[in-house]
Amino acid sequence: MTAQMFTIALLLSLSAIAAAGTIKTAPARTPSTQDDASFPPDGAPVKRFDAFTTGFGHSKRNFDEIDRSGFGFAKKNFDEIDRSGFGFNKRNFDEIDRSGFGFNKRNFDEIDRSGFGFNKRNFDEIDRSGFGFNKRNFDEIDRSGFGFNKRNFDEIDRSGFGFNKRNFDEIDRSGFGFVKRVYVPRYIANLYKRNFDEIDRSGFGFNKRNFDEIDRTGFGFHKRDYDVFPDKRNFDEIDRSGFGFVRRNVE
């Protein structure tokens, strides 16, 4: 009995000691007043000027903005795009607005678009809606359907359509029965040639005379030259209603 009472007394003593003990809790952590270094005071994330690549083969670098919804593309200011998926390469100081397959490019830029066999350089503007082509300033092109007219200080090599053009309006387009020669008059197939940009395209019934005059009735094409016909306007006007082509003003 004595041992049992001793055991009970010992247990009671231990319980009392445990109850009397002080349980210390960890002090509450005061919130830091230091701002996150990765965010500005307004809470917006810091804009980082680094390169990145997306799943559509797009590479973008430095001080630019991209808005790309679906296949639409908008790019602004001081950036570089390499869009190999669509065969597009664009560099330096330009703006692209590409909605669907429409294309608009302006000012001091270079385009190499091998997918459509197009190469264009320097000081020009391209507006390409659907497959139509419109280019202005220093060699204007208006290509509606498959009609094509290009002038001065540029080079086009468009092998996809069998077209090769070099240096001040020389054309050799054998794929479509087109041949251009200089200083060789020919009277075959209703053809007559004089000086500066002669075209002999007998396959399509083409007649061109003197400083880029074209009279092509077979395809609804009529062009008149300086002081030759009363309906002539300003050194190289083309009115090609059959293909919806109109070009005016001095080159």
UniProtKB/Swiss-Prot annotation:
Residues 21-46, 225-231, 249-251 form a propeptide. Residues 1-20 form the signal peptide. Keywords: Cleavage on pair of basic residues, Neuropeptide, Secreted, Signal. The keyword Secreted applies. The keyword Signal applies. GO terms for molecular function: neuropeptide hormone activity. Myotropic peptides that enhance both the frequency and amplitude of spontaneous hindgut contractions. This is Orcokinin peptides type A.
